[in-house]
């Protein structure tokens, strides 16, 4: 039966647990699958999390058990320890690239397509922003037979240059409320944050171009010599 977040949405803890498993599988494969303790640490880390959460071991275990019933997590038992891995793409019914984008939205909150491309660098290298947008559009246009949309494009926030995307795995969202900038941040702070994002995107593009040039010339990139 297709996953339908409108009738059986994930809880906030389930979303954090599932996305953390996906993240660690991509970024620290040598430590994956995860023990319960490692998973809780990943769920509660301060970096790359919005919102920051305080998930207990009991809450994480309950979420894992619930996700397993939905075929979204898998328990691997051994003599040394019980570990867990995700079954995100198959459990939700989406390709790997879409699972990456959904996980980032669950971990970091609403983001623009450009931010998603930058933040996914260690997970999956999308060719360009258009590629990211294509997968997002597929998720937004997911048919009713498959369980309906999994993302929504938020209205442009005041002063913002681009619209942000939000996931729907935890059910419907208040798109107008989510589109508003944080109350504590002023327009100047928003503009600065956007400028940083733009600069990071430019740096990523320049690095990719330089790597391509070095590869074409058969040269070794600086700092990579043995």
Curated annotation (Swiss-Prot):
InterPro entries on file: DUF480, WH-like_DNA-bd_sf, WH_DNA-bd_sf
Matches recorded under Pfam families: DUF480
PANTHER family: UPF0502 PROTEIN YCEH
Family: Belongs to the UPF0502 family.
UniProt name for this protein: UPF0502 protein Daci_5373
Protein's organism: Delftia acidovorans (strain DSM 14801 / SPH-1)
């Amino acid at each position: 039966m297709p996953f339908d977040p409108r009738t059986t949405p994930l809880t906030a803890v389930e979303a954090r647990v599932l996305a953390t498993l996906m993240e660690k599988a991509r970024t620290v494969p040598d430590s994956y699958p995860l023990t319960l303790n490692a998973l809780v640490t990943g769920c509660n880390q301060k970096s790359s999390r919005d919102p920051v959460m305080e998930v207990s071991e009991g809450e994480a275990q309950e979420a894992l058990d619930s996700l397993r019933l939905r075929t979204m997590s898998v328990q691997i038992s051994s003599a040394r320890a019980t570990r867990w891995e995700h079954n995100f793409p198959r459990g939700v019914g989406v390709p790997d690239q879409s699972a990456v984008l959904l996980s980032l939205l669950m971990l970091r909150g609403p983001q623009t397509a450009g931010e998603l491309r930058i933040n996914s660098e260690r997970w999956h290298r999308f060719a360009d922003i258009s590629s990211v947008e294509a997968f997002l559009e597929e998720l937004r246009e997911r048919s009713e037979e498959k369980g309906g949309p999994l993302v929504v494009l938020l209205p442009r926030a005041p002063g913002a240059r681009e619209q942000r995307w939000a996931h729907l795995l935890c059910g419907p969202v208040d798109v107008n409320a989510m589109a508003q900038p944080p109350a504590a941040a002023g327009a100047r702070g928003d503009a600065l944050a956007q400028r940083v994002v733009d600069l990071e995107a430019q740096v990523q593009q320049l690095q990719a171009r330089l790597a391509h040039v070095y590869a074409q010339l058969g040269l070794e990139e600086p700092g990579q010599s043995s």
